[in-house]
């Protein structure tokens, strides 16, 4: 087992799961390590396998479609199930021959599979049988039907011919929607809210207008393994470090190496700094949405020293440039430790006073309490992550479930609420700020000595030569918005397939049950409550289901970094 045995202890229950999948469902193990087991099952058994894993407590993290025709003349769909309570993942592979490219849908037994199945259809061209037909998820309506961008015969710089677009929405009888394409929008996003009077009865979302093809770029000749961290940290303007950390952990697993302990501590410290500044940003935005601009300004004032700390530790306010395969570029010396501790002491005191004030403001409690409710069963069905899950009573946090990096050396609690409303999501994030401060203090106190780069990762041995082809790895880290997941299938000198699942991708489908039955006036806060990772969702189209009349409402100003992959 070597270096890999340091990732997670072997789980005795995993053997029973593997036995069930192989003996009862006709599967076979294609790869295994302590934290992961990959099992290929026949197409006809997929739905029963998914039902068994789901009923055993698994959450569907995502599914990754892969064009394996150059390897075995077939397509494949990898379903990543997380056995969170046991601390390991079961990756279920199902293959589809290129001349019969279909797999059964599992969305009726695992609703969380909805988006990733549609993405597999759009990007690879796999037919999902047994589910209702819906419009495209990722590709625009004027994209040619027979071109699927993540197939290996489509180059990364391919420009498709234009075709006549199909109309997505019936035109309203009256009203002119502004968005998703409008000069006043920082980035285009589209919400369609159906209302009766002033009550929301249903909601639809159309995103991916600025899909950047990052996964395709990562597989292209332009990017080697050494360049992937640079690309990964640009997935999101807020969660850049957690994305680069996830990508790097996957590559380190595939290479059979692990960063030195000191480097892991430094990564964990930066991840918590990132969580603090992200949560403070969100709390300020929430105060603004609720009409309490004094709270917005004070929260962002308190946040600014955290940005200065980020620059002190990483060299960049956006935490870019620190991560490398095998370690980190910069160390933390005694002077930096003193500055971090002093800044966090002041931050803790100021934010405690502000947080007590915020949650006591009558208009905040009245607007946030009892609105945007997501029940525990709904959260479970959709496999939501992060503060959204924990506010609905789901005890999900990768730092506890799959203790990675230095988190096993820190003692901290996971804020948990059962109300599932907007106020609960506010309180989870407020408490997490204090927990992150506590984690950083502990890690600084326990910061070990030693190198910050693995001995194999040097100029003498290029990183691209350390990662052999044909390996699999799944890496996950707890981003501010929830679990971030990267799936890696290695190729020659670069990824064969690199799948990224940002937390907002998992949480946006939950907005539909959260918005239903609530007053239209509360929709902006409910949408903001998941901390959606796209820049400036400024507009929503509102349609009265009785009259057909449409109008456009403004959601909020400002914005955060995009996670449109």
Indicate where each model-derived feature is located:
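Terminal low-complexity/charged segments
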Residues: 1-203, 278, 343, 364-371, ...
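Metal/cofactor-centered catalytic core regions of large enzymes
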Residues: 43, 111, 141, 153-565
């Amino acid at each position: 087992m070597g270096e890999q045995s340091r990732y997670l202890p072997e789980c005795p229950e995993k053997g029973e799961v593997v036995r069930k999948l192989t003996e009862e469902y006709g599967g076979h193990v294609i790869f295994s390590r302590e934290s992961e087991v990959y099992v290929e099952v026949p197409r006809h058994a997929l739905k029963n396998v998914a039902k068994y894993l789901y009923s055993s407590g698994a959450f569907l993290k995502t599914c990754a479609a892969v064009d394996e025709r150059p390897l075995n003349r077939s397509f494949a769909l990898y379903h990543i199930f997380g056995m969170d309570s046991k601390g390991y993942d079961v990756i279920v592979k199902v293959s589809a021959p290129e001349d019969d490219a279909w797999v059964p849908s599992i969305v009726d037994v695992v609703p969380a599979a909805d988006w990733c199945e549609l993405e597999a259809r759009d990007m690879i061209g796999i037919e999902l049988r047994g589910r209702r037909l819906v419009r495209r998820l990722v590709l625009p309506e004027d994209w040619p039907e027979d071109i699927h961008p993540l197939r290996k015969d489509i180059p990364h710089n391919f420009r498709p011919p234009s075709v006549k677009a199909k109309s997505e929405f019936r035109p309203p009888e009256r009203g002119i929607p502004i968005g998703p394409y409008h000069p006043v929008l920082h980035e285009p996003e589209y919400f369609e809210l159906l209302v009766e009077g002033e009550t929301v009865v249903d909601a639809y979302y159309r995103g991916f207008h600025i899909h950047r093809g990052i996964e395709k770029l990562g597989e292209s000749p332009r990017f080697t393994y050494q360049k992937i961290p640079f690309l990964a940290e640009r997935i999101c303007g807020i969660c850049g470090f957690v994305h680069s950390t996830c990508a790097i952990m996957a590559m380190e697993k595939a290479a059979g190496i692990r960063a030195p302990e000191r480097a892991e501590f430094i990564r964990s410290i930066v991840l918590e700094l990132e969580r603090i500044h992200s949560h403070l940003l969100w709390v300020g935005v929430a105060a603004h949405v609720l009409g309490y601009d004094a709270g917005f300004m004070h929260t962002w004032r308190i946040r600014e020293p955290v940005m200065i700390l980020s620059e002190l530790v990483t060299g960049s306010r956006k935490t870019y440039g620190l991560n490398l395969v095998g370690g980190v570029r910069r160390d933390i010396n005694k002077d930096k430790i003193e500055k971090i501790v002093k800044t966090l002491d002041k931050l803790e005191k100021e934010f405690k006073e502000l947080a007590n004030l915020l949650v006591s403001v009558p208009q905040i409690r009245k607007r946030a309490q009892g609105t945007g409710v997501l029940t525990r069963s709904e959260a479970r069905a959709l496999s939501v992550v992060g503060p959204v899950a924990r506010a609905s009573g789901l005890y999900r946090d990768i730092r506890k479930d799959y203790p990675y990096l230095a988190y096993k050396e820190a003692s901290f609690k996971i804020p948990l609420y059962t109300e599932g409303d907007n106020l609960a999501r506010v309180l989870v994030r407020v408490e997490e700020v204090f927990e992150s401060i506590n984690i950083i203090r502990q890690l600084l106190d326990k910061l070990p000595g030693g190198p910050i780069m693995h001995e194999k990762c040097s100029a003498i041995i290029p990183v691209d030569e350390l990662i052999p082809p044909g390996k699999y790895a799944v890496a996950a880290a707890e981003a501010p918005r929830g679990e971030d997941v990267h799936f890696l299938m290695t190729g020659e000198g670069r990824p064969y397939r690199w799948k990224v699942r940002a937390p907002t991708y998992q949480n946006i489908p939950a907005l539909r049950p959260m918005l239903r039955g609530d007053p239209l006036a509360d929709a902006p806060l409910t949408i903001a409550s998941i901390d959606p990772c796209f820049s400036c969702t400024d507009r929503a189209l509102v349609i009265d289901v009785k009259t057909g009349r449409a109008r456009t409402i403004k959601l909020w100003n400002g914005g955060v970094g995009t996670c449109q992959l």
